[in-house]
Amino acid sequence: MNLALIFLITIFSFSLFFYGRSKSKSLSIENNYKLKALPKFYGYYLVLWCSLPSLVFLLVWTLFEPTIIKSIILKIAADQGAIMQDQNAANLIYEKIKAVYLGTYFGDIDSLLKESALSYAKFKNIFTNSKIVLIFLIVISSIIYALKKIKSNNKARDDVEIILKGLLFVSSLIAILTTLGIIFSLLFESIKFFSVINIFDYLFGTNWSPQRAFVRDASSITAAEYEDLKDAFGFVPLIAGTAFIALIAMLVAVPVGLFSGIYMAEYATKKIRRVSKPIIEILAGIPTVVYGFFAALTVGPFFRELGENFGLTVSSESALAAGLIMGIMIIPYISSLSDDVINSVPQSLRDGSYAIRATKSETIKKVVIPAALPGIIGSVLLAVSRAIGETMIVVMAAGLAANLTINPLDSTTTITTQIVMILIGDQEFDSPKTQSAFALGLTLFIATLILNYIALRVVKKYREKYD
C-alpha cells in the first residue's frame, strides 16, 4: 500500500510541474505583469508542495502505525483474558495474532486468537483508510496553498532554493545520524562484552577461540569461568592476520596498479588505452566470491604442489594465496585512480620540465609523480581499506584458524572473517561470544579511523608542498 501511495504521489506531483509552469505563464499574460521567476520554478514549487508534506506525513504514519496498533491489540487481548507476564510473552501473543491474520499460523486457534485477529484486521483496515483519506486531504490542501502563492506572483525561485537547501541539510543530517547510530550500536554492545572480558586480555591476548564462551551473566561468573574466558578472546592473532594478508595484497596491488596507471596515462597510445583500460576495470566488477573460488580451487593447490616440489610444507589455505588474489582484485582501484590523478597534473608542469631538457622518464619521476602524490596516496588508502574489509576471499582461501604466524604459507584469518563466523546462524545476543563481534567491529573502526587520519595528514603535507 505504501509503495502504491508513493508511486501515485510521485506521478501526480511531476504532472503538476507542467501545470504550474503553464499556469504561471497564463497568469502573467492575463494580468499583464512580469514573473518574478522563470516559469519552470513555479512548476518546481508546485511539485515540492504537492509531494513533500504528503511524503513526510506518510513516513511519520508508517513509523508510528505498528506501535499504536500493537498497543491497541494487546489491550484488547488482555481484556479478553490473555496472560502476559512480561514483554516477551506480550510480543509472542502479538506475533501469533498477526500470523492468524496473515493465515500463516498452523497451531490451534482458540477463541482468544480468533477474536484478537478479527480486531487486528478491523483496526488495520481503519488505519489504512484513514491514511489514504488524510494523505488525499494533505495533497489537496498543499496544492491549493501553492496555487494561491503562484497567483500572487511570489518569488518561486527563492522558495524552491530554500526547500532544496533544507533537503540537502536533511540528507547530510541522515548521513551523520547513520554514522552515529553505527558507532553507538557498536559501543553499547562492546561495553557489555568488556564487562565480562578484561580489555587488556582482549587487546594483548594471543589466543582466539570464542566457541569456549558459555557465560551469559557477568555478575554470576566464577573464577574458573573467568580464567577460561581470559584466554578465549585474544585480539592479537586477528589483527596480525588482517595486517599480514593486507600487506601481501598491497605488495601485489601497489606496484602493479601504480605502474599500470603510469603506463596508461603517460605511455599508452589512444588505441591501446581504449582497449586496455576497460579490460583492467573489468576486474573491479568481478564478485569477490568468484575470486575466492579461484583462490581456493586454483591458486591454493598450485602453491601447495609448488611448495612440495621444493620440500616445503604449504597449507592449501594460505595467507599467500589469499593475499595474492586480494591484491589482483585491488589492482583496478589503484590503477584507475592513479591514472586519473596523473592525467589531472597540469601540462604546464611537464612542459617546464621538457624545457630544461629533462627526459620523459625524468619528468614522470621528478615532476608528475610528486605532483600527483596526494591522489596516489588516496588510491592506496582506498585499496588498504578494501583489503582490510574483505571477507569472502579470506574465508575461502586463508581459512578460519586464528593462527599467530608470519609464515605466508600457513593459514590465518582476519577480523572481518571472524565477525561473519560469530554471527552466522541464530545466536544469543547476551553471550560474550556474540558480543565479541561488536568489539571486533569497534576495534576495526577505531583502527581504520586512525589510518585515515594519518593518511589525510600525509596528503595535506604533500599537497602543501607541491600545489
Task: Annotate each language-model stretch with its function.
Residues M1-I9, N125-S130, L229-A246, R304-Y333:
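Loop-to-helix entry region at the N-terminal start of transmembrane alpha-helices
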Residues M1-S130:
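N-terminal targeting peptides and non-cytosolic leader segments immediately upstream
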Residues I69-I132, K151-V170, L186-L247, T269, ...:
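Periplasmic/extracellular loop-to-transmembrane helix junction in inner-membrane transport proteins
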Residues K151-A156, I248-I280, L456-K461:
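Transmembrane-helix boundary motif in ABC transporter permease subunits
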Residues L247-V252, Y263, K270, R274, ...:
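Membrane-cytosol interface at the C-terminal ends of specific transmembrane alpha-helices
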Residues P278, I282-L283, L337, I342, ...:
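Transmembrane alpha-helices
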Residues D339-N343, Q347, Y354, L381, ...:
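C-terminal transmembrane helix and the adjacent membrane-cytosol boundary/short C-terminal tail
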Residues V394-F445:
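Interhelical loop and adjacent transmembrane-helix boundary motif
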